[in-house]
């Protein structure tokens, strides 16, 4: 059991937030008598008013008989005292009816989401709290389009294929799609199939995660555990197999939940962050879904953003690491490619199958060697990159299918291909060029030349190199306060004398490990190697991507809300710095940095709720490895967090803040970090 006395005391004291609850519980079971308060905090409904107060209570929907029947069936299945049944039925039917009316939802027969009330009923909540909890769960944890052939289930199939291609292929041949067996899993968060006790144990952990995407990994474990049974049984009856899969959660016991979450966390850590970041619009409270034209039903495999690929190339240690396979024709690859990419010409698959087979064999051997040698190019996860133009990428899908048919796990495609990679680097490094990110077989690095309106772009050679590879792109960008005119960016091979520019301090693969990945002029450096696990302060010279950020999701859907002044006045807060949080896209959010003896918190102000903020970030001071500032903008401070190991430092997060009097702020933070490090060393 958790420290029940500490938890009870914290809850009684008031002002308790989810972070405090997590720190006390630390993954252990929630005491039954405290579950109500813990869940209300986790769902952000503590102290919320009665949403039904303005409703006249009319149960007059066209589908009301259907709602009444399903609510009655729900009550009959629960262990409820006879004298409570009538009042409870009224509460449940009112909650369902008001939800349908307020959200303009037409109730469907046997809707799986009605079973979300099963574990809530056991808490014996008043009607207002019952509705608030139900509403919060529906908005935050039940995805849009959670129905037959819905987008959430197409995404789940891609996740299953990523980790268990053999099982996915088997189910595909049977034409068994995830919506046929997992609709009630997702629609009820397992409440449809599991007992109330088991469901409450699952929700105790799940609500503390505060991440709706974690449900995907709990569902994945359901299938992983059923794999041997599904593949081993000779079931010709499709419906029988679907029923077998659908009932998998029914066998769960309370004692299984700890292992369930441990396994889910493992698969979560082995999945590209793009899985979550690129599909945030599946969840949220907005009545109008974010515009997302991605047709996941036609996707051959998971897509990974180029920003994540670049960040993975910088990291060391555990985590998702990509072995990038460039599938463009040889002349395009030779003109310029990601420095760590292996070349596999997809055209060979039809033009010269024998040579293609040899190339695949070489690819797998190179991948193995790069992992064993600890090369920066090494990674278990194969990510295939095309040009980004449909007419040029006709064969890359055939290459992907080739690997998937061999049940190769961890297969993905670079979203937008090489064009997206170039555009991403251009957007973030227009003044400084590509540095060592993109190389050519001649050893010269591609760079970006910018020309003002009306100027013509003249290549450094007679049209060869990067200019012949890609079209000119027009990009618009902003400075701090002035809109700069559109510039035409011409990508050319830089054969002239290199200009002075900031280079990227990125360790490249050892030449001996993967000869074809690097050119003879690439430098080899291993920053941080042999350095003590302490942070450094200096001018910002490195390329960063804020891949850990999750702000693209509605904050209302995943962040806990706190009172800013209450947090500032906490006795353990040593420093408070008003600031703006700055994202890679230039967006700024009024925020507050709070420094305690051991941690730094970022509270992002809620513009629509004065005096309150979301806990946007919480970082241990012991994990700060570097603090940098821009020469031209010294008030723009970048914090890098990570952990050290035998081979160096692995960067786990990057945050940027615009801080008035930044010098005083960084000095105070530095002093507190030194105290933490001194304490750790002693």
From Swiss-Prot:
> Which positions fall inside the Rab-GAP TBC domain?
29-210
Quote a single Gene Ontology cellular component term. trans-Golgi network
UniProt-listed GO biological process terms: embryonic brain development; retrograde transport, endosome to Golgi; vesicle tethering to Golgi
Listed A to Z, the keywords are:
Cytoplasmic vesicle, Developmental protein, Golgi apparatus
Q: What's a Pfam family in this record? A: Rhodanese
- Where is the protein found, in the record's own terms? Golgi apparatus, trans-Golgi network; Cytoplasmic vesicle
Statement: the UniProt record of this protein carries the keyword Metal-binding: no
Stretches assigned to the Rhodanese domain: 318-426
Its predominant location is Golgi
> What function does this protein fulfil?
Putative Rab GTPase-activating protein which plays a role in vesicular trafficking. Involved in endosome-to-Golgi trafficking. Acts as a bridging protein by binding simultaneously to golgins, located at the trans-Golgi, and to the WASH complex, located on endosome-derived vesicles. Plays a role in brain development. May act as a general inhibitor of innate immunity signaling.
- Name of the protein this chain belongs to: TBC1 domain family member 23
Please name the source species.
Xenopus laevis
Q: What is the lineage of its organism?
A: Eukaryota, Metazoa, Chordata, Craniata, Vertebrata
